[in-house]
């Protein structure tokens, strides 16, 4: 079996590529990083270090690589033969790789289906990718490929911090991972992927991850920044921050249990597992890296505003701990982050109310805005 994977970064190698190799795919990575591409071409394997209570080393074999700018024809040929095409490139890059994928699909001479899975930190990633790919196909080509190409939405979760090693291919990952794939668009048989979880409806899993992993990680980062901690682990050793994060995840968890019928005890166990992941001593992640892009994270459908709004809609109360996280985000003034600089400028010109109205789409008189402003007074 053949898988073409766009993105040979840490997530691509340490998560997606690793599982595909374990599932007996020959994995062809596609990337723009010449150093990584050459190393994969020369070695044909790399090491993934799983850092938990004990450390395990996994050798990922049967891999190769192609350069996304210099080897377009070869990439197209591989897509034409592939059983699976996956991505881990970032949402903004999906439009840039869509034409290459379209050209590969056009060259397919077989009726054998191909599944395409965008493993991005976004809702409906594969749906979006299909829209971009379809823009490069005629109506006749679209019709011909519709019953041969399944674009499967998914949710992915594994913490892979920034890192450097003597061998540029080596990557350290946490033991926990979750790859949930929706089956609605499967054509023929469900793809064979060891460790993946296939479900009929992805939405509950997307929101569970967003409201727990992403919400919790952001809270640790913004609260940790206020107290001048450098790493996520240092911040989690602060009992006040630990309490704030745990309380916020109980608030977001209450929404999930109410909305999707998750078992309350099971969801509490999930929260505890997520908190333990943040404490993992082997996963050293910088506070400023996790806190980056605060304007995006202040969006109405993102990790802080969405659970806070849902809580208010469901229960008619303002979630105090989530509001505290939003307050900490608004105080994130790290000069090395362009969005943080822009956010502080907006607050300076339009006030907290103006910033929340502009980026979070919250009216200035909303009870959440009132609570956030109150929380900021004590930080």
From Swiss-Prot:
Binding site for NAD(+): 3-14
GO biological process: one example: mannitol catabolic process
Record Gene3D superfamilies: N-(1-d-carboxylethyl)-l-norvaline Dehydrogenase, domain 2, NAD(P)-binding Rossmann-like Domain
One annotated GO molecular function: mannitol-1-phosphate 5-dehydrogenase activity
Organism in which the protein naturally occurs: Anoxybacillus flavithermus (strain DSM 21510 / WK1)
Recorded family membership: Belongs to the mannitol dehydrogenase family.
Record field: catalytic activity: D-mannitol 1-phosphate + NAD(+) = beta-D-fructose 6-phosphate + NADH + H(+)
Keyword terms: NAD, Oxidoreductase
Entry protein name: Mannitol-1-phosphate 5-dehydrogenase
Record-level GO cellular component terms: cytosol
UniProt xrefs under InterPro entries: 6-PGluconate_DH-like_C_sf, 6PGD_dom2, Mannitol_1_phos_5_DH, Mannitol_DH, Mannitol_DH_C, Mannitol_DH_N, NAD(P)-bd_dom_sf
Pfam families in UniProt: Mannitol_dh (PF01232), Mannitol_dh_C (PF08125)
EC number of the protein: 1.1.1.17
